[in-house]
């Protein structure tokens, strides 16, 4: 296989190429591996530390990438480990006695088993795979597409084939100009309302011609082109029939369209088995095609024929799944194992030790909070998965992995390591399916890390890692991979940042499908509060989303604050809820320097002693006014006592918070500290808050509040 690689001309010396080929040949003979390689190797991408909530707030210093020519041959695992071993020590408080020694043994044994070291680790792994393939394996693995004579029909019926192998160079060049260079508007071609499912869908296609024709919707997975091993595992676990919602969602996913799906409640986890099925189907189809084409090339070589078969990217990883916590990662990996049909899993015990903890938050907390923070809630991890015909290897190196699961912060620490020599991003160059799950949790951690990852996705690699250019698809070489990458986004509720992933950062030529829950006045959050309390929605003018923070601030200090004591029936118990931390700092500074209010302020960075003291002083009336942030409420879910008047500087992104905040007043009413008829809730909003407004008042009322002549609306 090594002889098929084309020579590189990017400043790589002839001696280095020869050395790479020699090591490639050596690595396939296990007995020839040197003990020194065993000692130097670290094949563990995960980091043994339980970072606290504030770890997600670390900012990565961005530096200019132009002109950068450092030697980045070091493994991505080593880059992450070296950085974190010095800064983040493993905290034993979340592991049972004896677990630490078990993890250490797992680490030691992993290092001993995988003695691959040096700058050519990705070449060694790939060489190992290619040289171990025989024709019998190729035939047995190709359990669906075994008829080569039917290749033309397959291209038109199998979305995998038509999406990645059918597009011509001319078509992609034309679409690249329309979508990326001219930035022409996408067309909305279909809107559907599924009343029985309480959702609606919107389909957008790119300018020009879309890539894939739509698939016929089916209630049976067997009618789609899914690998037999995956299909059998799925049907054995979940049955042969799909529900209406499952069939509605799986159709665009299998058709390689971008999907934005709101699952509404953490209890709805059916979508996860659908995207893991799709990820495995994609991985196994990719592997089958490579194996088949390798056999064809061997046969053509024996017959002295020249054959061009392009079926690969620059690097092996094809699926990236971003998740907020190790517990979420553990659940997804378990789902992948369940559907993969693999007979054995390497490093499974080590994975369980580092990712699984049997722990749940107190029963007094809300259910969604307990789900978000259960188990190992560390937000610092990355792990590679490599599949073979019968086995799965956990903790595989990046460049030999098929699927990478990572938290955005864990991945961004590799992509923008302060030490330039340890930076790696080449392994993201050939990602074909991006999945971002539990987006709302990730957003509460730090969405900037997601933006960092998106910046490096499908970027042409700095080095080519002995890639065989005769096998690389032309759209990868021409830097057009982003036009074919599928992005799947799953969230409980939509926010502008999450919506932006599909709307502005995705260019999939197969199109985009956005699912949206139907929220009317009956099932809106406002209707579920259970308190007949006065709720006043006050609209202010804002010319653009960019000017919205300034317009909101000016309106608040000029119109709301001066009349606050006049409009409120109580002089104390005034809470101001502020979703944005930057707005919070701005208002806090104004109250401190320009008013005489006796106020307190608590946020996600406040010490525990300050949190306790400030809450007590507010409940007793010593502090008249309290500033309270959304992220603090997310991470602590306090029940604040003493609230009589509630001012929402902005709408909460999570509609559940709206109900919980208003129930602070309900608590005061129950304690007979205030009268329900005299209590007040005032909400500040602009027309740019339509997305958040819909979740609270419903799809019918939101357009009226945003666009009518009146600026003030009262509900009870």
Curated annotation (Swiss-Prot):
Q: Where can this protein be found? A: Nucleus, Nucleolus
Q: Does the keyword Nucleus apply?
A: yes
- GO annotation terms (biological process): maturation of SSU-rRNA from tricistronic rRNA transcript (SSU-rRNA, 5.8S rRNA, LSU-rRNA)
List compositional bias (Basic and acidic residues) regions by residue number.
15-26
Question: Which Gene3D superfamilies does the record associate with it?
Answer: P-loop containing nucleotide triphosphate hydrolases
Q: How does the record describe its quaternary structure?
A: Component of the ribosomal small subunit (SSU) processome composed of at least 40 protein subunits and snoRNA U3.
Q: Where is this region: Disordered?
A: 1-161
Any Gene Ontology CC annotation: nucleolus
Classification via Pfam families: Utp25_C, UTP25_NTPase-like
PANTHER family hit by this protein: ORF PROTEIN-RELATED (PTHR12933), U3 SMALL NUCLEOLAR RNA-ASSOCIATED PROTEIN 25 HOMOLOG (PTHR12933:SF0)
Q: What does this protein do?
A: DEAD-box RNA helicase-like protein required for pre-18S rRNA processing, specifically at sites A0, A1, and A2.
Q: Where is the composition biased (Acidic residues)?
A: 40-69, 110-150
Report the protein name in the record. Answer: U3 small nucleolar RNA-associated protein 25
Report which superkingdom the organism of origin falls in. Eukaryota
Using the UniProt record, give the first listed, main subcellular location: nucleus
Family classification: Belongs to the UTP25 family.
* Extent of Polar residues compositional bias: 94-104
Provide a Gene Ontology MF annotation, just one.
U3 snoRNA binding
Keywords of this entry? Nucleus, Ribonucleoprotein, Ribosome biogenesis, rRNA processing
Q: Which InterPro entries match?
A: P-loop_NTPase, UTP25, UTP25_C, UTP25_NTPase-like
């Amino acid at each position: 296989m090594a002889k098929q690689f084309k020579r590189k001309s990017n400043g790589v010396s002839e001696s280095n190429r020869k050395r790479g080929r020699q090591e490639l040949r050596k690595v396939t003979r296990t007995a020839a591996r040197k003990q020194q390689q065993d000692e130097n190797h670290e094949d563990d991408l995960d980091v043994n530390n339980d970072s606290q909530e504030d770890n997600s707030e670390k900012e990565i210093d961005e530096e200019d990438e132009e002109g950068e020519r450092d030697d980045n041959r070091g493994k991505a695992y080593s880059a992450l480990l070296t950085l974190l071993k010095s800064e983040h020590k493993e905290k034993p408080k979340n592991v049972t006695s004896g677990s630490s020694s078990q993890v250490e043994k797992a680490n030691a044994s992993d290092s001993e088993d995988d003695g691959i070291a040096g700058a050519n680790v990705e070449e060694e792994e790939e060489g190992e795979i290619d040289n171990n393939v025989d024709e019998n394996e190729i035939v047995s693995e190709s359990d669906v597409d075994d008829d080569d004579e039917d290749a033309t029909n397959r291209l038109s019926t199998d979305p995998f084939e038509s999406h990645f192998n059918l597009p011509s160079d001319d078509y992609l060049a034309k679409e690249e100009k329309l979508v990326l260079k001219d930035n022409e508007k996408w067309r909305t071609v279909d809107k559907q309302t599924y009343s029985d499912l309480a959702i609606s869908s919107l389909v957008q296609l790119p300018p020009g011609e879309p890539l894939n024709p739509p698939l016929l919707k089916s209630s049976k997975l067997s009618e789609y082109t899914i690998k037999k091993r995956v299909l059998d595992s799925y049907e054995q676990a979940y049955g042969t029939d799909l529900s209406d919602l499952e069939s509605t969602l799986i159709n665009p996913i299998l058709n390689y369209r971008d999907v934005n799906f709101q699952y509404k409640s953490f209890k709805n986890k059916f979508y996860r088995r659908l995207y893991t099925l799709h990820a495995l189907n994609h991985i196994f189809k990719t592997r089958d095609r490579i194996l088949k084409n390798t056999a064809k090339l061997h046969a053509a070589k024996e017959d002295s024929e020249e054959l061009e078969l392009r079926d690969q990217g620059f690097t092996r990883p094809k699926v990236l799944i971003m998740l907020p916590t190790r517990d979420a990662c553990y659940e997804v990996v378990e789902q992948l194992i369940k559907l993969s049909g693999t007979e054995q899993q390497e490093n499974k015990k080590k994975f369980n030790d580092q990712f699984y903890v049997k722990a749940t938050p107190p029963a007094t907390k809300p259910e969604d909070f307990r789900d978000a923070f259960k188990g190992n809630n560390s937000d610092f991890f990355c792990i590679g998965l490599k599949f073979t015909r019968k086995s799965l290897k956990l903790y595989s190196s990046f460049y030999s992995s098929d699927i990478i699961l990572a938290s955005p912060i864990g991945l961004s620490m590799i992509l923008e390591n302060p030490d330039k020599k340890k930076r790696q991003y080449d392994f993201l160059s050939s990602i074909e399916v991006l999945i971002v799950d539990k987006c709302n949790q990730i957003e509460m951690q730090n969405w900037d890390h997601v933006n960092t990852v998106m910046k490096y996705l499908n970027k042409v690699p700095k080095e080519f890692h002995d890639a065989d250019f005769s096998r690389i698809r032309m759209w990868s070489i021409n830097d057009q991979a982003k036009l074919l990458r599928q992005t799947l986004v799953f969230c409980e509720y939509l926010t502008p940042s999450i919506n932006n992933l599909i709307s502005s950062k995705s260019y999939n030529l197969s199109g985009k499908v956005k699912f949206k829950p139907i929220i009317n006045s009956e099932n809106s959050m406002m209707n579920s509060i259970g308190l007949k309390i006065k709720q006043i929605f006050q609209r202010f003018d804002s010319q653009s989303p960019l000017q919205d923070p300034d317009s909101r601030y000016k309106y608040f200090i000029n119109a709301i604050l001066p009349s606050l004591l006049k409009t409120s029936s109580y002089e104390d118990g005034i809470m101001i809820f502020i979703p944005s931390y930057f707005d919070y700092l701005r208002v806090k500074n104004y109250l401190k320097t320009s008013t005489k209010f006796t106020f307190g302020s608590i946020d996600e960075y406040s010490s525990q002693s300050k949190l306790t003291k400030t809450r007590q002083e507010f409940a007793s009336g010593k502090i008249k006014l309290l500033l309270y942030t959304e992220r603090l409420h997310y991470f602590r879910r306090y029940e604040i006592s003493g609230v009589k008047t509630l001012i929402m500087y902005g709408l909460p992104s999570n509609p559940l918070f709206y109900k919980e905040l208003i129930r602070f007043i309900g608590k005061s009413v129950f304690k007979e500290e205030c009268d329900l008829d005299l209590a007040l809730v005032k909400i500040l909003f602009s027309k740019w808050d339509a997305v958040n407004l819909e979740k609270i008042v419903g799809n019918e009322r939101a357009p009226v509040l945003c666009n009518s002549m009146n600026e003030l609306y009262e509900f009870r």
